[in-house]
Amino acid sequence: MRKPMKDLPVRRSYFSEKMKGVEIFSEEWGDMVCACHRFAKGVDFTPHLVGQPDDLCPVPHYGYCFRGVFHVRYKDGHEEVVRAGDVFYVPPAHTLWVDEDTELIEFSPLNMMSEGEKVAQTTLGSK
């Protein structure tokens, strides 16, 4: 299976609808989600993860950063910085924020993404 990234459909989700500066283009492929993200400078997922286990993202993400920089903080408190040109694996129990416009592609398990989206919609959907 293949598709030009520019042909991935816009994904409407809690995060793209409720967070300013978040654009998501994604498609479900088998048991994975292939998603291209554009995050504007200043995007911070931390307040939008309230209600998830430990108030952190429970989903693992594998990907590549095309442009920009993003920061990841894990449950144990350590932080990593992912820069343009880096491939990455971000395990469950993390938060993410960006200090500059950032674009990346990620691949994540569909069932875990669906559950995380459901929790966000249930706990934060009206905010």
Which ranges hold each PLM region?
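Conserved hydrophobic/aromatic beta-strand scaffold that supports enzyme active sites
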Residues: I24-S26, C36, Y62, E79, ...
